[in-house]
Amino acid sequence: IELIICCTVTPDMVFPATANVIAHKCGIKHGFGFDINAGCSGFLYGLTTAAKYVEAGFVKRAIVVGAEKMSAITNYEDRATCPIFGDGAAAVLLEATEEPYGLMDEVLYSDGEGVKHLHQVAGGSVKPASHETVDAREHFIYQEGQAVFKWAVVKMAEATEEIMRRNNLTSNDIAFLLPHQANLRIIKATGSRLELDPEKVLINIEKYGNTTSATIPMLM
């Protein structure tokens, strides 16, 4: 293993990278690793990044981890967030091959304007941890659920529609959709917009909740 990418918003500590902790515990000494902090999109960014390293011939094998301990940043007195999030982890191995399959394409979006709707107020360099921030519960997740719901339904469907259009695919060509497990309403609304049969849309949120960066690899 020459590369480990850990996708997480709940790292063990600010530094070193959790990927390096994983490498050490797995006895991997002759590679490199780094973390990607990109919220619910993190695993897709990590998968794409690792694939590019492999495709370029820079590494032969890479591991992408999605791991979260959302319970560490969830306020269990906040009914808007505490029923939603869960803890979990999963990993995938990518390696070079001559076989005619693999990652066909990717569509990635980010929109910094939405930061006000979903964030963690304190704990970073803008607002370091203090007695005041702890007392104000500013180290927990803050989410405006309705705003996030509207954006997620539109953008998840748009990204899927774009990648299908670019590759001349229809809903009949799709064996399974592995969506981020944000919540059941978002998943079902996205599947409906894409005109996919419900049995093609994989769901495990009822078991694990929203594990942020870990949802997609856990579905795999």
Residue positions per predicted region:
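Condensing-enzyme catalytic core mediating Claisen C-C bond formation in acyl metabolism
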Residues: 78-150, 154, 158
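Acidic, glycine-rich active-site loops and adjacent beta-strand->loop/helix elements
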Residues: 7-13, 38-41, 66-71, 109-111, ...
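Acidic-glycine-rich active-site phosphate/pyrophosphate-binding loop
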Residues: 13-27, 64-70, 125-133, 186-198
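Claisen-condensing/thiolase-fold acyl-transfer catalytic domains that form or cleave C-C bonds
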Residues: 10-11, 24, 28-30, 38-58, ...
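Flexible, glycine-rich active-site loops centered on histidine and acidic residues
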Residues: 55-89
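Conserved beta-strand elements of the Class I
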Residues: 2-5, 63, 175
